[in-house]
Amino acid sequence: MQKKLFLLDAMALIYRAYYGLIRNPRLTSAGRNTNAQFGFTSTLIDLIKKENPTHMAVAFDTHAPTERHTTFVDYKANREDAPEDLLDAIPDIKRIITGFNIPCIELDGYEADDVIGTLAWQAAAAGYTVYMVTPDKDYGQLVKENVFIYKPPYMGSKEEILGPKEVCEKWQIKDVHQVIDILGLMGDAVDNIPGIPGVGEKTAMKLLAQYDSIENVLANADKIGGKMGEKIKAGADSAILSKQLATIITDVPVTFHEEDFCIRDHNKDALSENWNSKPWVNVSWATRLVPVAKLLPQARYNWTSLATPPLRLLSLHRKIILSKR
């Protein structure tokens, strides 16, 4: 059997679910908006039933600052506060994930992107085919022979699977490593990454087609000349900073132990207890699931927080250890 690991970017999928149903919200009898719970759970079940993963995990962001915030204080500073309904959904969603016996991983000082990137490359090196489940374009820098982006269906669209070929075609680049150069030049409004003012996506792709990297673009600013050459000179520091901010870390202190990520039979009692009290989902969804490793023993996971020495300029770093109970 092919070993397939699916790594879910929790917050990206939760936001997507919440706003994807915003015009037709899933409300409880008390008027509570449960778009996020409904949408995320639907995506999770569809993945398990349709894609037949052998291994799975869900990565969450934390509220702790990261090295990116230390490097650039305005990193993600343009984001509005999340709606209260969305924030209230997170504990529900974590309980659902736990009911499926799927590990949740979060690590202070790092974003979910970094955790997923690290685990994806480790698992690929161990012979797994890895799917990073996210709508975020940043993940394009991580794809390789056995590592793909998996964009779930959204508002009527079909799922989209992107490998190196698809990522390079999308950005008109020669190698996926150039994704961070694209983002460094054009910036990323979602994360408040500045890029070079006046350089958009088309210009960034044109510059990289000729010069291959941000460093070479900056080195040839005089040759480029004109107003664009002046913009490049003026924005040189911003470009280098932006490339650094856009780079996903792949040496996070987490380890892929395949036995901890196995798909196991769901905990029907736990799901029933949780879902019977929630009008936004039908417990029959759980009974229709046919887990890949149905004969494996069920597992429970404890979340243990450990204080560790300073890491990458951070004063505090908490590591979530998955341990069978």
Regions found by a protein language model. Give the residues of each.
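Extended two-metal-dependent nuclease catalytic cores across DNA- and RNA-processing enzymes
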Residues: 2-3, 23-27, 77-256, 278
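Short glycine-rich phosphate-binding loop at a beta-alpha junction
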Residues: 54-60, 103-106, 129-133, 283-286
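Short, compositionally biased "basic patch" segments
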Residues: 12, 62-67, 83-92
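Long, highly charged low-complexity segments
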Residues: 261, 266-325
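Conserved DEDDh/DEDDy metal-dependent 3′-5′ exonuclease domain
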Residues: 55, 109-111, 135, 312-314, ...
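Short acidic, Gly/Ser-rich segments with clustered Asp/Glu that frequently serve as metal-coordination loops
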Residues: 12-16, 138, 325
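Short, basic, glycine/proline-bearing loop/turn elements
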Residues: 24-33, 97-107, 297-303, 307-311
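Non-catalytic, usually N-terminal nucleic-acid engagement modules in DNA/RNA processing proteins
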Residues: 1-57, 61, 67-72
